[in-house]
């Protein structure tokens, strides 16, 4: 459970910050307090998650989160590594392997670290009902979003891991769906966190559905089994749940040098993000936040030093939090049945105290 993995520190009231007296001072303060995060295409999950970061964490002149539209996880990694105006970005657990294959890059693991493992992005395959399983798409025309997107990389790798060779096409998702309707494509692929907005808004009629892609035992450990249910996509999943694959998303960060202005503002971001994480679990935020475990490690990745320091400082408080949870459970005459219900009741109890 996300919020039970660490206890969040109480906020310390800050002293008033004097207003800058010159235009140059104003610019310096704005740059020193603004953290940019590269997200994804409009309407996508990364775009919505980036907006949540801004809504929750923006705090006047102390911290501003500035979401930037991006192509997705594949291109985001290059943006984090090379663009001076990009501090953070949503990338995937298979992203470092993608960058290692680029012979132009050196020691990529030293430049891109992660702050937290977030959630899983599921493989979605939209195709006509005649396509019963992913194997039926062998040799067919399949769209993998725009070149450089997360779907372009992860989706292609997933198909290779599944042993299905296709004729890969790169077009944007709205165009791909229109091509699918017209018979110019055999399937449209999206690797994104469910529910995906452009998929939920797609009207399949009686022609299209989400194709199952069962998890094979031989697949890379970067990918995990997942499922898509009628609750996720009522129009596209009729009857049985669809088995599929998923890949993890992490909040990547440029590994800035300690003592720099960029490093110090990222320290403030980490403190705010971890310390106010409960706010991301509110009903108006994306449901994928509820999958997050802030303390989870990611194989092959190095955690950004300020994030690791924050977790280390709060380990003792985590023990205290467990004791507090025990006290809460003793107050419950009728204990909620599910983990999520327990956690939501616990949050209300703690806020009331």
Predicted regions and their residues:
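Pocket-flanking alpha-helical
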Residues: 54-55, 66-107, 177-179, 195-203
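Signal peptide processing junction and immediate N-terminal pro/mature segment
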Residues: 2-21
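Bilobed "Venus flytrap"/periplasmic-binding protein-like clamshell domains
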Residues: 34-57, 65, 121-178, 182
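Extracytoplasmic small-molecule ligand-binding "clamshell" domains
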Residues: 33-38, 42-89, 239-241, 342-345
